[in-house]
Structures are given as C-alpha cells and as structure tokens.
Amino acid sequence: MAEVYIAGVGMTKFGKSSQTLTELFCEAATRALASVSVEVEALYIGVMNPEEFTGEGNIASQIADALGMTGVPALRVETASSAGAAALHAAFHAIASGYYRHVLVLGGEKMTHLSTSATTRILAGVIDKEERRCGATMAALAAMITERYRKRYRVSRSHLERILCQVAMKNHLNGSRNPYAQFQGGVTEEAYFSSKLVSTPLRLYDCSPISDGAAAVVLTADRSDVRIAGIGQGTGPVSLRERDSFTSFSATRIAANRAYHMAGISPREIDFAEVHDAFTPFEIISTEDLGFFPAGKGWRAVEEGKTALDGALPINPSGGLKSRGHPVGASGVAQVVEVFWRLRGESEPKLKREVNRAVTQSTGGLGSNNFVTILERSDASRRSQRPAMVPSSSSPRAPRSKKDSVPSEPSEEGRIETFTILYVTPDGFLPPLALALVRDRRGRLLMAQGEDIGHLKIGREVYLRQVAGANYFTVKSHLTKVREGLRRLLRTLPSLALRRKGSESRKKAE
C-alpha cells in the first residue's frame, strides 16, 4: 500500500456568504492548488444535500466544469454531515491502491440562505423516520443523549451546564483567533446562560451554527512534510432506540481503533485533536470514544483544563464546528486543513507542546457513519513502542424486516429512559415539545411525544398510546400511582380472604 501525503490545502472563510456553492468550491480549490505543482487526476467531492439546500444536482460534474477540469474523473460522496471526511477517505484509498497519484478532495455546503426551520427539516432527514414522526430533530436527540450521559455518570444538572458552558467558551475563544472562523468573538458565562434553550439541557451556544463554506485538500503519493498515517470508518444504528449505548458512539470507537491500528500508535501518542462538536456534549463523548479519557471522565478533563489550548491535550484548537462553523459537507475536510496548518506551524497561537501527530473525527448523522483520520509530520518519531490497538469488531444485527420499519402498537405502560423538552421545533410542531425514549412493558424502546412538559424524569412511569402511527406518553402522577396500588391491593383481597378461610377450615378439621 502506497503512502499518502498532503501536498496543499485551502479553505474559504466560514459563515454567511453571497457566493454560490460552486463559487465556494472553486475558491477553496484554487487556494489548495496555488502552492502545488501537480496534475490533478481525479476529484472527490463531499457535499451532503445540494439538491435541497440549493436545488442543484449532478454537483460533481458542475464542479469539474467550473474548475476547468472536464475530462477528469469526478465523484460525489455523501454520508450526511461526515461527507467531507468520506470523500477524503475515498481519495486516500484511490492513492494508496496505486490507481491515482494526485487527487483533489473538496467538501462544502451552502445553507444560510434558507430559514432555520427549513434547514432544520433538511438536516433532520438523516435521522430515523419514527423519531422524526414525533417531532425529533438533531438537537433534540443530542439533548436526550446528553441527559442520559448526565444521569449515568451522576453529574448534577447545574454541574453539567457549567461543563458545557466551559466547552462553548473554550471553542469560541479558540475560534476568535482563527481568521476562517464564523464567530470571531468569545462567549462569556453570562452570555451562555442567558442564551435561549434549544432542547433541554442544550442552549443556543451548545449548538453549531448554520454556515456556508468549502475546504480543499490535495492528496498525493509524492512525499511531503505531512502524511496520513491511519484512517478508520465505522457505522452504527440510525435510530436512537436501537442502540446498545446512549452515552457513546460505537461508530467512532470502531473507526478510531481501525485508524490507530493502521498508524501503529495508541491514543497517548496524539498531540491534539479536531473533533465533531456539532453539540458541545458531543466533544466530550468523542474524547472518550477516541480513547483519550475513560468513559464518563471526559467532562472532568474539561473541568480540569486538559482540553484547553494550553492543556495536556488541546481539543478543537481551531474553534471546532461550534465556532469555526458547520457547513455540513465541508467540516470533515476543514478539520484536516486545520490540522495540516498546525502541524506545519502555520496556525496561531502555537500550542505549548511540540506537535507531531493529530486526530480528526467526523460524525455522520447522529453518529451513524463516522470517520477518524490520523495525520502526522513525516519526520515525526514515535515516543514509544506501545502496541497498537486492535480493531474492534461489531457483530452484525439481523436485517430489519418490512414489518419492523412500521411502528407497532406499544403496550399501555412504560418507563422513561431519557427525555428532552424541545423549544426550537420543526414545522408542524408547537413548542415546547416534550420528547422521551420510553421502554414499554414488552421491553421495546419507543420514541414518544409527551402530552405535557411537566414531571419528566429518567425512570418515571408513563402511559403510552398511539395515534396515526405516532407514539404519545403521559406521565403517571403520584396520585395515580397510589390509586393503582390500591386497585391492585383490592384485587388481591378476595383471594387473601379465601386463602385465610381455607386455612381456618383446615385447622378446624385437624
């Protein structure tokens, strides 16, 4: 397998742009090609949904034409919000196999011209249909994961909010030093806590913005000063209700183990990382899934300053998706651009430690198609001979039948596994909207919409019903539980009386 290097990179400023999607791609490509003298043999383009965002199809051919590269093979790659990383990995394989020597990788999206509700609807298209039927959005599902994480690792709600605030403040501070970032200013604690709730416990500053932008990387078989040492991809269930864990993304763990295995290193040899922080808690979970911190300890690393720019392991020194912006198809490529610059000493401010090796982690959908890339300086020496991690295997699940894809009638009662109150709702749903993942009496997990927003708590018992294919729940009140207990007791009284009478009769007979 041939070594794969990075010859050049380029990126537009992220944010709200008057340029078309094609113009953004061309600007990024022109910047990446400006400092290299290679003949591009193929184009790999990562973009999530130009058909709905900008009404454009056949985008790969359009970009090739606009760049004056007609005749050059052009391929569009899509894996939701990890599309840019997917394009990079596809190009890596093409060079590593020896089929091409020089490939231009592009990632981009144009989103800001649409309303927030329209963009939310398009982005929600990557999540499970049944969960969408109840009004779930990406933010709502991220919030439900956050609430479950808080409960599992026994972090109080107020404590968790302070941790998430620290992540947001850190990334906005980092982004304020990045000329390509959408947000050029920091965020204060006061601003964070006064920002509106999007989906409890997530606030506005916990969510990445809607953005326009593009990024480009030229991959080559010719030696340069930065190489791609390892790559990995993993997939996981699309729906939240079918997951083995609500506090970790198995797709990231699989991808990370494969990348570490290919690179022949362990997580301890990574100097910094750019991770997919579309929501602040996802940064914390990603650092655990990448093996930097034990499960349930990532939030402590934030609290102790370990992930800050001057910490032991800086996370998102560019500002991440949270501050740099998140034009969904561009983000996976932009992460590699940022790492390339920092490994070459071209990013400010400099990290306090010498940097030789870094990781990028890109998430597709709700963690259902994730990519990990390890980049290193070509002259980097290994600090130790630690054994590489072995790729984790994932046992295939049985294929879902047509019957499984149709929501079945839930049993009448269940228990809340996790929940959120959504304040920024999709079209057709009024805020505030209570959503919960409920385990019914048959042991099945169901996404359900609440009749009201009061008394929500993990473990609380609820009534379930289904209307037009959508599930609804009502929290059992304390009075209801008392009444049910009395009914059960009253139902047992006749049998108790009969048993007592029978016992007395036997005694008399004796």
Predicted segments — roles?
Residues 1-82, 90, 149-163, 167, ...:
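Conserved active-site "lid/cap" helical segment
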Residues 1-22, 27, 129-132, 152, ...:
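Condensing-enzyme catalytic core mediating Claisen C-C bond formation in acyl metabolism
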Residues 1-5, 50-103, 110-141, 183-209, ...:
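Conserved catalytic cysteine-centered active-site region
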Residues 424-437:
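Short aromatic-glycine-enriched beta-strand elements
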Residues 451-465:
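Short nucleic-acid-contacting surface segments enriched for D/E, G, S/T with interspersed K/R
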